[in-house]
UniProtKB/Swiss-Prot annotation:
Keyword terms: ATP-binding, Cytoplasm, DNA damage, DNA recombination, DNA repair, DNA-binding, Nucleotide-binding, SOS response
SUPFAM superfamilies: P-loop containing nucleoside triphosphate hydrolases, RecA protein, C-terminal domain
Protein name: Protein RecA
A Pfam family of this chain: RecA_C
Family stated for the protein in its record: Belongs to the RecA family.
GO molecular function terms noted in the UniProt entry: ATP binding; ATP hydrolysis activity; ATP-dependent DNA damage sensor activity; damaged DNA binding; single-stranded DNA binding
PROSITE patterns in UniProt: RECA_1 (PS00321), RECA_2 (PS50162), RECA_3 (PS50163)
Annotated compartments: Cytoplasm
CDD domains found in the cross-reference section: RecA (cd00983)
UniProt binding sites for ATP: 67-74
GO cellular component, one term: cytosol
Length: 346
């Protein structure tokens, strides 16, 4: 066995050769350089930002959002797009389902004029477009809606009754292998929206599974299970849904946390509703009977009135959000102009 100095010298020579061939930073000791903080994109719900552990969705990673139909998956993704754009970022939406509603997206705060949209014919075309956009280095976030709609070319060109076992799974596996490194280098967040299917013959455990094979489960840094748990009503009229999101996988923070928030029809995630819920939980907002009070000032009787007060008084809402984030140690900068994504120490 070589002596320790000889081994160290041989290692240094090898590292120098690697850096010469593949560029500086291709290989390094983990302690050589201070880890860069994880940059994030806020989700629009402070409860979900807290559940994610770092204040939002991590940049440069693969995110999977799945759940039953009409549970709020696309709404959560569009809020992330709006927040990325608010910070000056560029966003793309791959509408494989051909179901994007520009008017609804605009109501959620998405700048539809600058949003890049593609409605591809095949799964191969969709993922090739995503790969090219990511490798441009100019994209901050891309949403693929949805994995189930990424139909392989062979299936489209075949007959209706033909069997195409594993085609989509192989397509996703190949695409994610190519994409993951480029995402990290460019700092682009890729959100894959996915649907649920039932596994036949399951006797024990959950029969639910997601489409597109197992590759996405492995490559995703964050997987979010979105469920509608309650219908919100104003009298007899339905005005929205109470939504629960479970973080079933998280590579950047402890997983299995849950968040609940309101999604209002035509308005999306209620930021003010989340602030009221979290403010009460953290002791910044006092609830006495039906009244909500903040630092001696009455916000309103009932959650809806308190929500409207914060909607009309953005400065108070920003102040509450700033205090919650400081107490919990999650970081997005809250200014008088709104919420801006910022690096988070982790």
């Amino acid at each position: 066995m070589a002596q320790a100095p000889d081994r160290e010298k041989a290692l240094e020579l090898a590292m120098a050769q690697i850096e010469k061939s593949y560029g500086k930073g291709s290989v390094m000791r983990l302690g050589d350089e201070v880890r860069q903080p994880i940059s994030i994109i806020p989700t629009g719900s402070i409860a979900l930002d807290v559940a994610l552990g770092i204040g939002g969705l991590p940049r440069g990673r693969v995110i999977e959002i799945y759940g039953p139909e009409s549970s709020g998956k696309t709404t959560v993704a569009l809020h992330a797009v709006a927040n990325a754009q608010a910070a000056g970022g560029v966003a793309a939406f791959i509408d494989a389902e051909h179901a994007l509603d520009p008017e609804y997206a605009k109501k959620l705060g998405v700048d539809t004029d600058s949003l890049l949209v593609s409605q591809p014919d095949t799964g191969e075309q969709a993922l090739e477009i995503v790969d090219m956009l990511i490798r441009s280095g100019a994209l901050d976030i891309v949403v693929i809606d949805s994995v189930a709609a990424l139909v392989p070319r062979a299936e489209l060109e075949g007959e209706m009754g033909d069997s195409h076992v594993g085609l989509q799974a192989r397509l996703m596996s190949q695409a994610l292998r190519k994409m993951t490194g480029a995402l990290n280098n460019s700092g682009t967040t890729a959100i894959f929206i996915n649907q649920l299917r039932d596994k036949i013959g399951v006797m024990f455990g959950s029969p639910e599974t997601t489409t597109g094979g197992k590759a996405l489960k492995f490559y995703a840094s964050v997987r979010m299970d979105v469920r509608r748990i309650e219908t919100l009503k104003d009298g007899t009229n339905a005005v929205g849904n109470r939504t629960r999101v479970k973080i079933v996988k998280n590579k950047v923070s402890p997983p299995f946390k849950q968040a609940e928030f309101d999604i209002l029809y035509g308005r999306g995630i209620s930021r003010e509703g989340s602030l009221i819920d979290m403010g009460v939980d953290q002791g910044f907002i006092r609830k006495s009977g039906a009244w909500f009070t903040y630092e001696g000032e009455q916000l309103g009787q009932g959650k809806e009135n308190a929500r409207n007060f914060l909607l009309e008084n953005g400065g108070v809402a920003n102040e509450i959000e700033k205090k919650i984030k400081e107490k919990l140690g999650i970081g997005a900068v809250v200014t008088d102009d709104g919420v801006l994504p910022a690096p988070v120490d982790f």
